[in-house]
From Swiss-Prot:
The gene is argH. PANTHER family: ARGININOSUCCINATE LYASE. This is Argininosuccinate lyase. Keywords: Amino-acid biosynthesis, Arginine biosynthesis, Cytoplasm, Lyase. Pathway: Amino-acid biosynthesis; L-arginine biosynthesis; L-arginine from L-ornithine and carbamoyl phosphate: step 3/3.
Length: 460
């Protein structure tokens, strides 16, 4: 027999370096509070059902509550020899109250215990992610309201396409982040399921009351299959998938802000708090924090792919491979929360160069679709109108003349249907204002969407 809590079967003590390789206490101690919460609920159930004497349950409860206070004060010390947070807590409890601590593990396995800890850990933190998303959405809506009529180029293939408003652009990301919010909300439901009571994999012979434990821990549901309860990491994969999609959205917007802050674009300027300088070039103002968010996206993608790969060939039920589920979750959580906070501050603090944005739409031929649509309203088939305007654009590029600068006679030579009223249609403002179809960039639409989105935020 060795000195491990599970050591009855073993005769040889493992070398310290072997223990260190197998230990998870270096990272799963982040679940210390959740481990104590789960144990308190479990021992309450053991006492109430008579599985252990109530006096023993009371002693264990007092010991666990003392450990909670010690944890809050930063006084608990964990060891590699006890390998994980569960055995460390049991060892600390035994040191506190003696052998009666061994009764706590009645009708429980580390398999359902660790699953419960991880469920609780995410259950406690998902609301924080949703709140951070809501804060970012609030900034987006506020800025969209201010810039509902701020005209800028819209792009496809990174080429000027049609004029839009900066407010319309911001609300596109609002929609993406709303879907992120809804995904995390849905994952919260899948996280709100209690595994405890499944024991190692097959349930237990003791007359446990899983409903009581669920009520104590605030779980809405209970796993109905003990094998599934200890094997399931779908909720963790959902969280990482949601996190990866969220970081993709942040990264796409970060990329645009980085480009737009360059000398060549000069659409925006990031605030000093979210920029850095160069150690050699005095003029530099680098968008480091936007770049960091773009870079950290790969880190979260890696967390998702890592856990997907870990889980892809694991037979039921628990296997030691599943110890690798926690670090990617902990890291992804910290990464997305930090990124959301930085991004919210960065958007609040940036300066929009409205004049420069508007100027960028004046000689870029992004009003070509307006002229084609104009001809279509005059009875010219759209495909023919498209060809006519394409030829005018080519001519304008060669002569450095915008469509709205071409004489009426020149336009009429290409299409006799064109009249003087065409010039009113060719301004960027007109192009924006005419896009009143549902979801379009018209200022009136943007303001309606702002009102709708404000209501959506209030419903969070």
């Amino acid at each position: 027999m060795t000195d491990k809590l599970w050591g009855g079967r073993f005769t040889e003590k493992a070398a310290h370096w072997v223990d260190a390789f197998g230990a998870s206490i270096g990272f799963d101690q982040q679940m210390a509070q959740e481990d104590l919460e789960g144990s308190l609920a479990h021992v309450k159930m053991l006492g109430k059902t008579g599985i252990i004497p109530q006096a023993d349950a009371d002693t264990i409860t007092a010991g666990l509550q003392h450990l909670q206070k010690e944890l809050a004060a930063g006084k608990l010390h964990f060891t590699v020899e006890n390998e994980d947070i569960h055995l460390n807590m049991e060892a600390l409890l035994t040191a506190e109250i003696g052998p009666v601590a061994g009764k706590l593990h009645t009708a429980r396995s580390r398999n359902d215990q660790v699953a419960t800890d991880l469920h609780l850990w995410l259950k406690h933190r998902l609301p924080t992610i949703k709140e951070a998303l809501t804060n970012l959405q609030t900034v987006l809506v506020g800025q969209a309201k201010v810039h509902a009529a701020t005209i800028m180029p819209g792009y496809t293939h990174m080429q000027h396409a049609q004029p839009i408003t900066y407010g319309h652009y911001l609300l596109a990301y609002f929609e993406m982040f709303q879907r992120d919010w809804e995904r995390f909300d849905f994952t919260q439901k899948h996280t709100d399921i209690l595994p405890l009571g499944a024991a190692a994999l097959a349930g237990t012979t003791f007359p446990i009351d899983r409903t009581l434990v669920a009520q104590e821990l605030g779980f809405d549901q209970i796993y109905h299959n003990s094998l599934d309860a200890v094997s399931d990491r779908d909720f963790a994969l959902e969280f990482l998938s949601n996190s990866a999609i969220l970081m993709q959205h942040l990264s796409r917007m970060a990329e645009e802000l980085i480009l737009w802050s360059t000398y060549e674009f000069n659409y925006i300027e990031l605030g000093d708090d979210f920029s850095t300088g160069s150690s050699i070039m005095p003029q530099k103002k680098n968008p480091d924090f936007a770049e960091l968010i773009r870079g950290k996206t790969g880190r979260v993608y890696g967390a998702l792919m890592g856990l997907l790969t870990t889980m892809k060939a694991i037979p039921l039920a628990y296997n030691k491979d599943m110890q690798e589920d926690k670090e990617p979750i902990f890291d992804a959580y910290n990464t997305i929360l930090g990124s959301l906070h930085i991004f919210t501050g960065m958007l609040s603090d940036l300066t929009v160069h409205e004049k420069r944005m508007a100027e960028a739409t004046t000689h870029d031929f992004s009003n070509a679709t307006e002229l084609a649509d104009y001809l279509a309203t005059k009875g010219v088939p759209f495909r023919q109108a498209h060809a006519i305007v394409g030829e005018l654009v080519l001519k304008g590029i060669k002569t450095n003349t915008a469509l709205q600068e071409m004489p009426l006679s020149e336009l009429q030579a290409a299409a006799p249907q064109i009249q003087q009223d065409v010039y009113a249609e060719l301004t960027s403002k007109a192009a924006v204002d005419r896009r009143t179809s549902l979801g379009g960039t018209a200022v009136s639409n943007v303001l309606k969407e702002v009102a709708r989105d404000e209501e959506m935020i209030a419903s969070h």
